Structure formats: C-alpha cells, structure tokens
C-alpha cells in the first residue's frame, strides 16, 4: 500500500524529465470552495470548506495535458463562541495533498472545455484551537494530531476562458478516520473509516 501511495509523487517528479521536448510548463494557482458530502458532511455539520492549490501543467498535442498539484483544504468541524465574551474555540479538519491530474481538452488545444481525472496522496489532520482576550491581554493554544494518510481520486470538468483564467468543478474522494464528535476538544482518531467525499469549485489562474 505504501508503494502505491508513493506512485503519484514519483510520477510528478518524473514528468519534467519526460516532457522537456514538449515545451515549457505553465504554473498556476487555484482558490476553491469545498462542499462536503456523505460522512464528511456529517462530521462538519454541512459547513463549506476552503482551500488553495499550486499547479504545474504540461500540455501535449491532441488536447492532452498532465498537471501535478499541491493542495491544502480546510473544513471546520465545530466552533464555540459564548456571547458577551472574546473567548473562542474551534476544531478543524485539514487535508494536505500531492497528486497528478490528466486533462483532455475537447477542442484539441488548451482552451475551452476539458475533462480531468487524477489521483494522489492526502494527509488529514485534526486541530483544536482556543483564543481569548481579556483587557490588553491575549492568550491562545493550539493542538494538532495526525488523522491518517490515504490514497485519493478525483474527476471533473472545467473551462479555460483565457490563457490565464479558468474554472473547474471536481468530485474528490479522500478517506480519513472518524473522530469523537461528542468531545469538542478532542483530536484523537478512531479506526473507523470515513469516505472523505466533497465537491470542489475552483477558480484557476495560470501564468
């Protein structure tokens, strides 16, 4: 399983060597909103997540492209903010991933409608944060525990409006482990698998 999990990373590192004769890569950044589904929707109380990605893309002839990516996505699990107080505590589920996407541009060139599918490795973490301000004093605490590292997959479609601006929608599957929902301060995982499904809408900017 570990060797399979390292495959997308090895592929991403090998791509620059294999694509040197096909032109220079383009670099990009995406900002995304994530709508949780299934188990993730239950664990985050239907709260939208947010994230960002760094992208490198090699374009091939015939509308084909390969795109390694580095992703950071965060979902809020719970927030506690008592009235008439500056005290705040929150739990967040974060996903940091490295993957590779295949893109196919329907028109044969890197513009307009395209389809995409990919795979990658994701590390999930659960964090607990508190902050409080009394007068001129400020205090905070932070605790984070690794939840799991898992293989994931994604598929979707997008539209490249210009050479710089694009919009993409993807379904992402990236399993994680369940945690104690009844204790808002806990970052401990269990051995129960959760599906980790979400829909992602991303604005993409390339240069």
Residue ranges, per PLM feature:
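Cleavable N-terminal export/targeting peptides
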Residues: 1-24
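Gram-negative (and chloroplast) outer-membrane scaffold detector with strong preference
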Residues: 22-26, 33-35, 50-136, 159, ...
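Surface-exposed strand-loop-strand hairpins of Gram-negative outer-membrane beta-barrel proteins
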Residues: 32-55, 143-148, 182
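Extracellular loop and loop/strand-boundary signature of outer-membrane beta-barrel proteins
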Residues: 37-43, 83-90, 137-144, 184-191
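Outer-membrane beta-barrel porins/channels
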Residues: 101, 135-148, 179
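Individual transmembrane alpha-helices with interfacial aromatic-anchor signatures
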Residues: 144-146, 150, 155, 188-196
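Conserved active-site loop/cleft motifs that coordinate metal ions or position small ligands
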Residues: 165-171
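C-terminal/domain-terminus segments
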Residues: 172-202
């Amino acid at each position: 399983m570990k060797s399979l999990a390292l495959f997308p990373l090895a592929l991403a590192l090998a791509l620059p060597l294999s694509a040197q004769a096909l032109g220079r890569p383009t670099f990009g950044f995406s900002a995304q909103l994530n709508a949780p589904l299934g188990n993730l929707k239950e664990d985050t109380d239907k709260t939208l997540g947010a994230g960002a990605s760094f992208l490198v893309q090699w374009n091939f002839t015939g509308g084909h492209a390969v795109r390694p990516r580095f992703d950071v996505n965060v979902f809020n699990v719970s927030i506690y903010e008592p009235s008439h107080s500056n005290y705040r505590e929150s739990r967040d589920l974060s996903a940091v991933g490295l993957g590779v996407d295949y893109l196919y541009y329907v028109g044969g060139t890197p513009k307009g409608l395209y389809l995409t599918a990919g795979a990658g490795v994701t590390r999930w973490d659960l964090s607990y944060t508190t902050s409080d301000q009394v007068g001129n004093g400020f205090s905070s605490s932070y605790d984070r525990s690794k939840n799991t590292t898992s293989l994931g997959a994604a598929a979707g479609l997008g539209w490249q409006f210009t050479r710089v601006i694009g919009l993409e929608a993807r379904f992402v599957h990236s399993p994680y482990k369940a945690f104690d929902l009844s204790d808002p301060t806990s970052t401990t995982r269990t051995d129960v698998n959760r599906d980790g499904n979400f829909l992602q809408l991303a604005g993409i900017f390339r240069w």
